[in-house]
């Protein structure tokens, strides 16, 4: 799987970089986790700092275009991203937020 960076936009207010990328793959569309790991390796970041938001593969093509958010730290990702996005990318949500939700219930 080859990863090519199409565009990078800095977002200093949220301590992240928005990245658009293109994957070239031989088999079926790769999993979100394998894409996250490949993109993190390409950008020299830890995998917990990368959140893959969208993957789009056209029918019959072996190319996938995607959008990811690369944070300065995993804590920044946990503070900004929605819980379902963190779950999809296998990034553990804050335990404090889980405890607060359990207390309210």
UniProtKB/Swiss-Prot annotation:
InterPro entries: Nucleotide-bd_a/b_plait_sf, Ribosomal_eS24, Ribosomal_uL23/eL15/eS24_sf. SUPFAM superfamilies: Ribosomal proteins S24e, L23 and L15e. Residues 93-105 have a biased composition (Acidic residues). The keyword Ribonucleoprotein applies. GO terms for biological process: translation. GO terms for cellular component: ribonucleoprotein complex; ribosome. One of its GO terms (molecular function) is structural constituent of ribosome. PANTHER family: 40S RIBOSOMAL PROTEIN S24. HAMAP family: Ribosomal_eS24 (MF_00545). Belongs to the eukaryotic ribosomal protein eS24 family. This is Small ribosomal subunit protein eS24. It comes from Natronomonas pharaonis (strain ATCC 35678 / DSM 2160 / CIP 103997 / JCM 8858 / NBRC 14720 / NCIMB 2260 / Gabara). The lineage of its organism: Archaea, Methanobacteriati, Methanobacteriota, Stenosarchaea group, Halobacteria.
